[in-house]
Amino acid sequence: SGMTNHGKVLKMAPRGKFGEKVDALGLAKVAGVDYIARLAPTNPARVARTVRRAIMVAREVGHSYIQAYTSCNIEYSIPTPDVMKDAFEIEKERYGFEEIISPAAKAYLDEVEKKPKKKKSD
């Protein structure tokens, strides 16, 4: 995994992870991706908003990339009830929410998001 620390011994890397982390956000930025986000699943509304924004930009402006941290409770032997606790800790330590938005994508999102939302009719 590109998010696993160098040297970490895991089932998928029994001798320790030999490669350094890949700066996927940096690669996306250099590649000119229009909407880039990093997030952990600690805030469901933010996850939904981020995915919605990425899809809208991909449909109308250009490429989107989301890097989402998910606790691998099997690989790291995290008990299922502690998965969200792990996600909050990782988010605080090194995986805070970040968005990188191109000027074209920002203009599009500003325009779309200022429109009044349609109400569902019963």
Q: Language-model features: where?
A:
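Conserved thiamine diphosphate
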Residues: G7-V57
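Glycine/aspartate-rich loop-and-adjacent alpha/beta segment that forms the canonical ThDP
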Residues: T50-D122
